[in-house]
Amino acid sequence: MSSDANSDDPFSKPIVRKRFQATLAQQGIEDDQLPSVRSSDSPDVPDTPDVPVNQLSSPPLSLPETLSEGNAETLQNLSDDSEPEMLSQSSTSSLNRRMEDSAIDPSRGTRKSQSRGFDYDPAGERTTAPVQKKKKDEIDMGGAKFFPKQEKKHVYTHKWTTEEDDEDEKTISSSSNRYSSRPNQPAVSARPRQPVYATTSTYSKPLASGYGSRVRHIKEANELRESGEYDDFKQDLVYILSSLQSSDASMKVKCLSAISLAKKCVSPDFRQFIKSENMTKSIVKALMDSPEDDLFALAASTVLYLLTRDFNSIKIDFPSLRLVSQLLRIEKFEQRPEDKDKVVNMVWEVFNSYIEKQEVGGQKVSFDMRKESLTPSSLIIEALVFICSRSVNDDNLKSELLNLGILQFVVAKIETNVNLIADNADDTYSILILNRCFRILESSSVFHKKNQAFLISHRSNILISSLAKFLQVILDRVHQLAEEEVKKYISCLALMCRLLINISHDNELCCSKLGQIEGFLPNAITTFTYLAPKFGKENSYDINVMMTSLLTNLVERCNANRKVLIAQTVKMVIPGHDVEEVPALEAITRLFVYHESQAQIVDADLDRELAFDEGGCGDEEEEEEGGDESSDEDGVRKDGRLDRNKMDRMDQVDVVHALQQVMNKASAHMEGSVIASYHALLVGFVLQQNEDHLDEVRKHLPGKNFQNMISQLKRLYDFTKATMAKRVESNSGFRAIERVIEYLERLE
């Protein structure tokens, strides 16, 4: 190719390239290894004269990305194998001479040609300069283009709060540097914006990748539902209380608000919300003016009744008890008679929904109220039953019941209803009220000396006189009542016995007062010698134990009562025998013998049923000798033992049935043993200071001695000591049993 190109031609100016210093010493050898370009390799390029090979050569040149038509010759010249050498960046004369020696064909196209000199040769391990894009900040100085060194610009970054934010910023900056080489990066970050109400508990910080964020602490569906219910309960309660506490609201509005609150209290979750948030005081404070209106008082009593129905009922303080005492005295509706039926119907609907909701949940509800008997007093009495039973160990509550006049009202209520029953009035509702009143007094008098003394001496012993009258009414009327009514009377009688046991415990005054009431002691003995065996089969155990315990309290420290008891003649019936009248001491002794023998029979049956074969050699011999012995369908052999082979073939239902029978017999054995023990304890106390009647007792005992009584009392002592050892109040009971055992042992 011709080399007559003008040196002033602008396209003949050299393109400055950096020399790689690491390859200068090997440049001559590498030039010899470069293959030459033949005409056959580029058919469109004409032959060019040979160019002498220089000892030094520059590395391959990187071409601009865009070339105009004017520099096509330069492109072709740079693609040859004999590329001119660049001695330095500042020397341009040698490059100009090299460019003049090369002939550029103007007819040659501007397309980029391939050369083996620029191909990657893995064997040569050539270090090539990376292809770089043309920078915008190139500087043209005298025909040479310099790329100034790019210095990192210092950018001020404000540190806002904590070190954690600094670490997050470092993470984000490192991640952005890592992905800075990616093409087509968006100008706006892909991280979603957080709402202004976002908190650290629900929204987390962005991930290191920079793509979105991760939400932590996601609540479960049930947690979301509970949270929503909690908010609803809180808003509803605040709204209702605002109406109840408003001074401008009328009594009608407050009454309707209280009924709305009662409808909310039907839900167990709402009642639990009230207790967990300690809203009881706020509710009681909002209902403090309810006694001023009878219908408002009915709605308030409904709220208190529902709040006390749970096992973990609300805590009752002094303001609550004061409200209860005020509502307890409202027994009639004397205000707003035109709205009475409407309010009563609304309250009755609340109770119907409550009963329905409890039955759906599988819980049995005992609700014996009638619509026509709905009053604030009746509802508060029902609520007091639960309040006192849950606070049986709270002495402060028991004292406040007395100070606020609640016990006085309950005693008066008992007197009124006993008189109604004695006058042959409608006694169904009266029996229900007596049942509730007995429960309240029982809980409020247990191990509380002050309340016991008050109940005994209040209004000239009106309580114990009313109880003795009620006992006489039961014995006179039980023959005329239907079976269902008899059950109600016997159940109420058992509760009355519990109350009398509490107030007569270690109280000589009560014992003497009860012994002085005409007919009380013989009637008390008749309850377990005649009434319980004949009419109260379901409550026979309770009547026997409760009434025997009451008589034990009466004769333990009062010899006058012992003499009165010995002188009495009572009716007695033993199962399988006719009714007969015998002396009281003989009746108690014969009942002891009966129950003790029943316990021994059950004990022997249990020994036979629980004696399983162990599969020893002796058993095999017995089986060979008695091989003809067959077992019945229940798996019991003729000798009374359970057949193990038969038991192994029984399915699970049959095994459960067999075990249930064993447990029933064990329960019957325990009941018989306990009743016999209490009869023996009563006989032992009656015989003290009355040794003249020892022969009357011995002639009815097995072996004519007291050994069976002593053994039963020792069992009772061990059982009581094991179950009541931690209670200080039971120490007197231990000592009483010990004294009777020692007394009977001396008699032997």
Swiss-Prot record:
CC annotations in GO: germ cell nucleus
Domain of life of the organism encoding this protein: Eukaryota
Cell location: Nucleus
GO BP of this protein: DNA repair; meiotic cell cycle; mitotic sister chromatid segregation; positive regulation of double-strand break repair via homologous recombination
Biased segments, Basic and acidic residues type: 634-644
Region described as Disordered: spans on this chain: 23-199, 614-644
Key words of the record: DNA damage, DNA repair, Meiosis, Nucleus
Biased composition (Low complexity): 35-64, 172-182
Subcellular location, principal: nucleus
Effects seen without this gene: Mutants have an egg-laying defect and reduced brood size with 20.8% displaying embryonic lethality whilst 28.38% arrest at the larval stage. Recombination intermediates accumulate in mid pachytene nuclei resulting in delayed meiotic double stranded break repair. Irregular polar body extrusion from the egg pronucleus and localization following meiotic divisions which can lead to aneuploidy in the embryo. Altered meiotic chromosomal organization due to shorter axial elements in late pachytene nuclei.
Cell membrane found in the keyword field: no
Compositional bias segments (type: Acidic residues): 616-633
Residue intervals of the WAPL domain: 205-723
The UniProt record lists the keyword Transcription regulation: no
Annotated Polar residues bias: 68-79, 87-96
GO molecular function: ATP-dependent protein-DNA unloader activity; cohesin unloader activity
Pfam families registered for this protein in UniProt: WAPL (PF07814)
Role summary: Regulator of meiotic chromosome structure and function, playing a role in sister chromatid cohesion, possibly via antagonizing the coh-3/-4 association with axial elements in nuclei during late prophase, cohesin association with chromatin, DNA double strand break repair and polar body positioning following meiotic divisions during oogenesis. Regulates the morphogenesis and temporal assembly of axial elements to control the organization of meiotic chromosomes in pachytene nuclei and is also involved in meiotic chromosomal remodeling in late pachytene nuclei.
Entry similarity comment: Belongs to the WAPL family.
Protein name: Wings apart-like protein homolog 1
Originating species: Caenorhabditis elegans
Gene from which this protein is expressed: wapl-1
